[in-house]
Amino acid sequence: MVKIKEAIVVEGRYDKNTLSQIVDAPILETSGFGIFKDKQQLKLLRKVAALRGLIVFTDADGAGFVIRNHIRSAIPGKYLKHAYIPDIPGKEKRKAAPGKEGKLGVEGMTPDIILQALRNAGATIEGETEKRTTGAITKADLMTLGLAGIPGSEEKRKKLMKKLDLPEHMSPNALLQALNLLYDLDGLAEVLEEL
């Protein structure tokens, strides 16, 4: 079991159950879209985020990004880290049919994928060196590298996200945040050469 300093917020009880078998950390639920109406739960998330930091770990589908963006708008960014799972087609074992977008959610991920997503988010893991955001890659760099602001940039971003196992619904700003956790500018340029 991996001990993590930050609390983790997930969409529902099955996600919470999956994570609780892998990590030792406080795990809170949004109850899916319930977070939009539950002011007390949002207040709790704000308090926990200010005390120990909060890792937002939602599914890679459209609904997961709506929930993630709601949390992002309600809690100061300095308290948040974002863990992203890759887009993997399939369905969870407990379900009769795949979800609307046909992707596995957090509950359907392997322990290795979950731990890698948490490490990539910069989770503070006991016994490991803390990963810090370098901030070396800027929005201007994304434009220079052809990932934003020019014809074809959206397609290039999609190819990059697929190569890096990042979800397709990431905005350019969310992609920038993830890239700064994973690469410096030279490292990103090398990855882009392989596309």
Question: Can you describe what each PLM-predicted range is?
Answer:
Residues Y14-D15, D61-A63, I88-G90:
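Conserved nucleotide-binding/hydrolysis micro-motifs of P-loop NTPases
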Residues E6-A7, R13-N17, Q21-L51:
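Acidic, glycine-rich catalytic loops of TOPRIM or P-loop NTPase phosphate-binding modules used
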Residues V10-E11, T58:
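Short beta-strand scaffold positions
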Residues L44, G62-F65, N69-P76, D112, ...:
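Phosphate- and other anionic-substrate recognition elements at nucleic-acid/protein interfaces
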Residues G34-K37, F57-I67:
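Acidic, metal-coordinating catalytic cores used for nucleic-acid/nucleotide bond scission
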Residues Q116-R119, A123, E128-L195:
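C-terminal, charge/polar-rich interaction regions
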Residues I85-R132, K139-L142:
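Activity-critical C-terminal alpha-helical subdomain
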